[in-house]
Swiss-Prot record:
Keywords: Aromatic hydrocarbons catabolism, Signal, Transport. The gene is nicP. This is Porin-like protein NicP. It holds the Pfam family OprD. It comes from Pseudomonas putida (strain ATCC 47054 / DSM 6125 / CFBP 8728 / NCIMB 11950 / KT2440). Probable transporter, possibly involved in the aerobic nicotinate degradation pathway. Residues 1-30 form the signal peptide. It comes from the Bacteria. GO terms for molecular function: porin activity. InterPro entries: OM_porin_bac, Porin_dom_sf. Belongs to the outer membrane porin (Opr) (TC 1.B.25) family. Induction: Repressed by NicR in the absence of 6-hydroxynicotinate (6HNA) inducer. In presence of 6HNA, repression is alleviated. One of its GO terms (cellular component) is membrane. One of its GO terms (biological process) is catabolic process.
């Protein structure tokens, strides 16, 4: 292994670093209880093995397997707020990843940065901070952020999560109503030590990376969610813009209805997107509808989902993230132009059988009617099996083990067989 290098400090870390002193000064004029006693910090150790075999390869790539093993550490530290009308605090995020096993012919798994030589980096790291302000039930954060929004979903799918540099405002001044707004200026990808401009990722069967060369340093959003009916029903409206590339609207509806020993639920949404501003990436047209119905009783939860993509293009999002649509899976997205897909899924919590900590997920999604541009209709399908266990007691209490097996098949894209093994353990620092 190469010698360890110091962590990269993002611009937000330098910005918020200067603000930490300001927060402490503000705190000095108030009671120490809020800023210090409200502080929390956790350190998660994450061991990740990722293996993906490619068969019936379609496209320019000739790589038949991706396989890497890595160790990561995720530090999340958060202060409380200073006392008074305006509360001030600081959040700090530290990320560190090490290569345990990799080879040039099996690299590019998303766990580790790829070097020009084709090898994966021995280690990488990031350190960032955000200053936060709070008045009543309104909070503003500026700096290094991990947003989890329907228009920019938090995608912690590999060794380390991605982060964004910018500002987020959230207000809960009125019962049931959450108002959100923000702007991000750059991102640090999940397998990178550096920050960069943001790019759009579109599901295009012919050229999946056709928008990746177009970047923007402005992602703007506003949104409103309203929960009512004892929080069993919620509706949402969001607007997002990756400046000069695309703009997108999102409408959501969620409901849960108790019915005897059952709880029935629905999660539905509609996206509508088009080109934005100077259209540096050209014209764009997409709308997407999804619905996921659930029925829960005892340890069982059953799901049935339907998803439909319309417009001239596939679904679009900021890369490299996922999205909240019901049939989007970590391997296939089922969001190509014209695609219609159906899902059946079963989750089980084994606590119902006296085995607390053990859970399973089995799901199957099938898609058709893909406009491939190759002279035939595209079809794809995927089966995922997840088993997870969290040790409940003893010296290893809290240790999480997750196993995932995936089989994905298509007549217009590369077939995939995938296995993941993830061990995680979170330590409460203070």
């Amino acid at each position: 292994m190469q010698g360890f290098t110091a962590p990269r400090f993002s611009s937000s870390a330098r910005l918020a670093g200067g603000c930490i002193a300001a927060a402490l000064c503000a705190e000095a004029t108030a009671e120490e209880a809020g800023f210090i006693e409200g502080a929390r910090a956790t350190l998660q150790a994450r061991n990740y093995f990722f293996s993906r075999d490619y068969a019936d390869i379609k496209g320019a790539s000739t790589q038949s397997r991706t396989q890497e093993w890595a160790q990561g550490f995720i530090l999340n530290a958060s202060s409380g707020y200073t006392q008074g009308t305006l509360g001030v605090g600081v959040d700090v995020t530290g990320l560190l990843g090490f290569k345990l096993d990799s080879s040039p012919e099996h690299a590019r798994s998303g766990l580790l940065p790829s070097l020009d030589s084709g090898k994966s980096a021995d280690e990488y790291s990031r350190l960032g901070a955000a200053i936060k302000f709070k008045v009543s039930q309104t909070e503003l954060k500026v700096g290094e952020l991990m947003p989890n929004l329907p228009v920019l979903l938090f995608s912690d799918l590999r060794l380390l999560p991605p982060t964004y540099q910018g500002a987020m405002l959230e207000s809960r001044e009125f019962a049931g109503l959450t108002l959100s707004a923000g702007q991000f200026r750059s991102t640090s990808l999940r397998d990178s030590s550096n920050s960069q401009k943001m790019y759009a990722l579109v599901n295009d069967p012919i050229n999946p990376a056709r928008l990746a060369r177009f970047t923007s340093d402005r992602f703007n959003y506003v949104g409103a969610d309203y929960a009512f009916n004892d929080n069993r029903t919620s509706v949402g409206v969001w607007q997002a813009q990756l400046e000069d590339i695309y703009q997108q609207r999102f409408y959501s509806f969620k409901h849960a209805e108790p019915l005897g020993s059952w709880t029935l639920g629905v999660n539905a949404g509609y996206f509508d997107a088009r080109e934005d501003g100077s259209k540096v990436a050209g014209d764009y047209d997409n709308h997407a509808l999804f619905s996921l119905f659930s029925a829960k009783t005892g340890g069982h939860t059953f799901y049935v989902g339907y998803q439909q993509i319309g417009g001239d293009d596939g679904f679009i999002q900021v890369g490299a993230n996922t999205n909240p649509m019901g049939n989007t899976l970590p391997t296939y997205e089922f969001s190509a132009p014209g695609e219609r897909s159906w899902q059946v899924r079963h989750d089980y919590n084994f606590v119902a059988l006296g085995l607390p900590g053990l859970t399973s997920t089995l799901r199957y999604v099938k898609g058709r009617d893909v406009e491939t541009g190759l002279g035939f209709e595209g079809r794809d399908r995927e089966r995922d099996l997840d088993l997870a266990y969290v040790v409940q007691s003893g010296p290893l209490a809290g240790l999480g083990i997750r196993v995932r097996n995936v089989m994905a098949r298509s007549n217009y894209r590369t077939d995939i067989d995938e296995n993941r093994l993830i061990l995680s353990y979170t330590i409460k620092v203070f």
